[in-house]
């Protein structure tokens, strides 16, 4: 497979994986919150890297997911005080967590792949050069990761489509039916965090 085709395929996989979640997030008026998550997960990546010293460790995904959920929790916590509106709360949490991550990167991760330019800008053009061998075939890691997160998102949405749909359009009905909308809310946010960190590795923030 040519480098150009590989890049296009990776871009398509990541785009579709993100758009699957994006539909529900727009319906819930959470597009700005997910923008915050896509940046604050950088802190989880950095902290996990400090622990493992490996850029390919699964702990990076776990750390990023936890920070993504922390972002949602902090935004809701600040909003519930009624001192500021949700958009202001998002701005506060985004600025604090993302700036901490950038400071840590610039100060403690010199001369390694985890640098500010790579994180903020990304470079999908290099994706074809990072490959994994499967059944004797060399396949770009971006294709494997993109396809994996696409399948994960598709499976979760397919299995819980009814529950997610009811939780979005009628929270009271969801509670009446015992569907626990908060569970599906954080499930959706977890998928957003995982999808974002996979995309981070390929195209940056």
What do the predicted segments below correspond to?
Residues 1-3, 20-30, 49-58, 165-175, ...:
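Short juxtamembrane and helix-loop transition motifs at transmembrane-helix boundaries
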Residues 23-113:
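Short loop segments and helix-boundary regions at transmembrane helix junctions
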Residues 100-156:
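Transmembrane helix-bundle core of multi-pass membrane transporters
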């Amino acid at each position: 497979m040519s480098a150009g085709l590989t890049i296009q395929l990776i871009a398509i996989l990541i785009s579709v994986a993100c758009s699957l979640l994006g539909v529900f997030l727009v319906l819930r008026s959470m597009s700005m919150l997910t923008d915050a998550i896509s940046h604050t997960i950088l802190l989880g990546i950095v902290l996990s890297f400090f622990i493992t010293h490996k850029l390919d460790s699964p702990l990076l995904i776990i750390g990023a997911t936890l920070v993504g959920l922390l972002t949602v929790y902090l935004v809701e916590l600040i909003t519930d005080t009624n001192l500021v509106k949700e958009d202001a709360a998002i701005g506060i949490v985004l600025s604090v967590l993302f700036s901490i991550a950038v400071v840590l990167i610039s100060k403690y991760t010199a001369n390694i792949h985890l640098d500010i330019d790579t994180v903020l800008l990304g470079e999908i053009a290099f994706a074809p050069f990072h490959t994994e061998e499967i059944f004797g075939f060399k396949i770009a890691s971006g294709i494997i990761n993109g396809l994996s997160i696409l399948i994960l998102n598709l499976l979760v949405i397919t299995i819980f489509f009814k529950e997610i749909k009811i939780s979005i359009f009628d929270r009271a009905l969801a509670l009446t039916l015992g569907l626990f909308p908060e569970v599906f809310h954080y499930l959706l946010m977890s998928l957003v965090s995982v999808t974002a960190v996979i995309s981070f590795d390929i195209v940056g923030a």
